[in-house]
Amino acid sequence: MSHVTRFISLLVALLMLCLSAAFAENSGSITVVDVLDREVTLPVDVEKVVITFNFEEYFAVTGAAGVDKLVGYSHAYWEGRREDAWTTYTTAYPQLLDIADVGYNDNINVEAIIALKPDVVLMSAPVNYTFMETQFDKFDAAGIPVVFFNFHAQTLEMHRASMELIGKVMGDEARGSEIADYYEEQMNLVYDRVASMQEDAGKPSVYMEFSMGPSQYGNTWSTRMWGALIGQCGGRNIAADLGDANSVEIAPEQIIAENPDIIIFTASPRNDVSDNVVLGYGADAEAARAALRSYETRTGWDSLNAIQNGKLSGIYHDLSRHIFDFAGTQFLAKQIHPELFEDVDPEANLADFFAKYMPVELDGVWTITLED
């Protein structure tokens, strides 16, 4: 093939690419690649949305305008698991109460979603993909695109990809990228300082537990969720060898034997538990601190390093696996290595994020220590 022929072939290829892009734009559709490397074609102007998880990330991109674009969502995730967030959003936007419930997890109502005729369905890959593997043909037949994001991976790269993806889908790529940049800057406050630690600086031992009240031992985390974050923040998780499940049980005797340097409870409102630590929207600092102190009375805990040194704290459970979870990571890092993060104020940074990007006001208490 001559140089001239090759040049002409290249020009033809470029022309076809430009024509293809122009056709897609003129036809009112775009193609995105989701976090599962699936190419998905959807309308340029999305007006009707169904979402099953990570509502805050959607609203961070759309603002209040996103409420009117919702035609269906999973009520059980919000109303059933995160009562404080549910109350906050439905108080600010009562119309959310009238939007269709499309089910949750393995009980997603595919027929109900199809009947709503959304322009796009937004789903969490780790939460919804296994169920959806047998349902794609129904959505394809109805011409309804499904896009997957992933905030469960707890990596900077996947958070960024997911946030930028939502921005593209909702027609505001610039905002999605801006939020991703903000997140990266906040996370690097932790990553850079932990990376600068001397190898012989030591890793304090950490125990984390889902607060269920002092009389009941909640689950802990091994290699996932909070367990993974302990390592990222320069700590040693005493439950690291207990398996790879989402959460794991630990014997009370093992906690005492491990004698952790730091104990952190994750907390959220639960209607079925009256004496747990309550943090999040609308939470009260003094009530949360009193509940936190009640854990000091557990049998054998008076001998633990964490209790003797006042290293007992609490954090809102959903300051993980969200685009605002940088505040949770910063708080965790500050508890583990206070000397490295003395100038970092996680709740102030969280408040700044909400003021910039969220369509509801930040109130309540999201982290708590004994010293405040």
Question: At which residue positions do the language-model features occur?
Answer:
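Bacterial Sec-exported substrate-binding components of ABC uptake systems
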Residues: 6, 19-59, 174-209, 341-372
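Hydrophobic core
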Residues: 12-20
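Short helix-initiation/N-cap motifs at beta->coil->alpha
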Residues: 35-37, 96-109, 243-252
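A short, structured surface patch at a secondary-structure boundary
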Residues: 57-115, 120, 124-127
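Extracytoplasmic ligand-binding site segments that recognize negatively charged/polar headgroups
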Residues: 75-83, 125-134, 149-163, 198-228
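Structured C-terminal subdomain patch of bacterial secreted/periplasmic proteins
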Residues: 100-101, 154-168, 177, 181, ...
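Alpha-helical, coiled-coil/dimerization segments enriched in small aliphatic residues
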Residues: 219-246
